[in-house]
């Protein structure tokens, strides 16, 4: 059963080949049998999920119409609210916080009869690219348990890679869907800013955050977006970008002009560079034309991103003070000490580092030097993308400079920040991008290529990703690191 895509599972439900209860129980069995080695989940919603599965089976038995996601098990990153379920953001600060309402994406998924399996691990408050900054436990890469799955949506990518669920929700602030998708050999889609509601997402960087799906195939990205994309009155930043459905758009003619910022590829590991050019060759064989585009301003993207993201994080996380929200220290002599001790005990080192950086760049003495100049460079970066899209339909770039790194290779914070060089610009410019598996490194680890489009061109970007997937014949990669995960046992 794990070999079926989300679409195939839904077809099996519609054709009465499988019950929703049987599907749900099967995936819980996989999680309970193997997740101890991987650590993708923080909590499970088993009783709730089986109850919903039973109700959907009853609807089927009565001949009632069923939703777009009927019978599809879905994992949810633990910064997205599900009513009555803990939302911890993988932080001691929110260890006991129970969500009082559903996020819009969760509400729309359940309206379409999707089954929510549980909450997935992440870097604390979505700050990180290794899922080693979770306060509770690390998540391991199913391809090599000594390597990181990427982050911050590492639990989401690992869960899909291990086939614990065919769809998982992640959030992408600077590459947090695309990078772990590439590291774990799955598809990851970062929608345009405003394409998917952020209502019920715990904010990290409010002008950068976007919820999106991770899946095994591009068709399931389209299915998920059809279920939950679109305007939401509870999120004033959302817009109605799309005509028709994502699923229908996959069959349309693929754009022919693909831009590549060749001057921006020098930092790639050699086999990653070879793989990227092989991916371009696939698109050329199918009739696309590759042209050079000038995106030299991207060299400023990482510092600008960490100025803007840290400033927004410091502002958003100010509410977690032990009074309004979050952990409160057991003892303090005065209010100031209570604030300080509660935040020191509640936040991990990486979150603390970014809050300090954010407060520094927003300080009266430094705001003009850092934050305002950073926003000016952000505007230049947006202009550079717009100029590039006047010459091409889509931009292709690598997702990462290397395959997934080992634990012992986790570098100092600044070096880790620099690894975001191929992903953060997309968020700064509000653009959509899809990461699609593009093959394996010399060490047998998955690699990914990303296709980037203009804001609102999400359907076109999924279409390009689907075309690459079909013509590269790189589809449904199965990791080998966990014994019994794909050989033997129930199927």
Curated annotation (Swiss-Prot):
UniProt keyword list: ATP-binding, Ligase, Nucleotide-binding, Protein biosynthesis
Active-site residues (renumbered): 77, 152, 176
Enzyme Commission no: 6.3.5.7
Any GO BP: translation
GO MF annotations, alphabetized: ATP binding; glutaminyl-tRNA synthase (glutamine-hydrolyzing) activity
Keyword Transport included in the entry's annotation: no
One GO term describing the cellular component: glutamyl-tRNA(Gln) amidotransferase complex
One Pfam family matching this protein: Amidase
Signal peptide: none
Catalytic reaction(s) noted: L-glutamyl-tRNA(Gln) + L-glutamine + ATP + H2O = L-glutaminyl-tRNA(Gln) + L-glutamate + ADP + phosphate + H(+)
Assembly, per entry: Heterotrimer of A, B and C subunits.
Protein family per UniProt: Belongs to the amidase family. GatA subfamily.
Task of the protein: Allows the formation of correctly charged Gln-tRNA(Gln) through the transamidation of misacylated Glu-tRNA(Gln) in organisms which lack glutaminyl-tRNA synthetase. The reaction takes place in the presence of glutamine and ATP through an activated gamma-phospho-Glu-tRNA(Gln).
Name of the protein in question: Glutamyl-tRNA(Gln) amidotransferase subunit A
